[in-house]
Amino acid sequence: MAQNVEQQVAQLQQLQQQLSSIVAQKQQLELQLREIERALKELDEIEEDTKVYKTVGGLLIEADRDEVKEELEDRKETLELRVKTLEKQEKRLQQQIENLQKRLQKALQQAEGGGGAGAA
């Protein structure tokens, strides 16, 4: 019984680490999404003949405004899909963690109850 509980505790810790990693990844992607949304807003607000630059490697190069906007919209769409995927993984892991916590709690209660009944 104790070995099974130890395995479940180890599994719980592993799931919690995975959840933490997914949450961190999701936060990074959401930050990138906000930056892209700000850039798209700025592109919408500037005059069409305003010079636009984009970063390529360590350089800033002049680029076509519409082309930059299209690239940003594509990137935004990709990031939104990745965030949705991570959200699904996050929910699935949260459910697994919750189920495992319930099983662990039940196993510990049975262990305590079994020990008390044997002593009586």
From Swiss-Prot:
<dbReference type="GO" id="GO:0051131">
    <property type="term" value="P:chaperone-mediated protein complex assembly"/>
</dbReference>
<comment type="similarity">
    <text>Belongs to the prefoldin subunit beta family.</text>
</comment>
<dbReference type="Pfam" id="PF01920">
    <property type="entry name" value="Prefoldin_2"/>
</dbReference>
<keyword id="KW-0963">Cytoplasm</keyword>
<dbReference type="InterPro" id="IPR012713">
    <property type="entry name" value="PfdB"/>
</dbReference>
<comment type="subunit">
    <text>Heterohexamer of two alpha and four beta subunits.</text>
</comment>
<dbReference type="GO" id="GO:0005737">
    <property type="term" value="C:cytoplasm"/>
</dbReference>
<keyword id="KW-0143">Chaperone</keyword>
<dbReference type="GO" id="GO:0006457">
    <property type="term" value="P:protein folding"/>
</dbReference>
<protein>
    <recommendedName>
        <fullName>Prefoldin subunit beta</fullName>
    </recommendedName>
</protein>
<dbReference type="GO" id="GO:0051087">
    <property type="term" value="F:protein-folding chaperone binding"/>
</dbReference>
<dbReference type="InterPro" id="IPR002777">
    <property type="entry name" value="PFD_beta-like"/>
</dbReference>
<dbReference type="GO" id="GO:0051082">
    <property type="term" value="F:unfolded protein binding"/>
</dbReference>
<comment type="function">
    <text>Molecular chaperone capable of stabilizing a range of proteins. Seems to fulfill an ATP-independent, HSP70-like function in archaeal de novo protein folding.</text>
</comment>
<dbReference type="InterPro" id="IPR009053">
    <property type="entry name" value="Prefoldin"/>
</dbReference>
<dbReference type="GO" id="GO:0016272">
    <property type="term" value="C:prefoldin complex"/>
</dbReference>
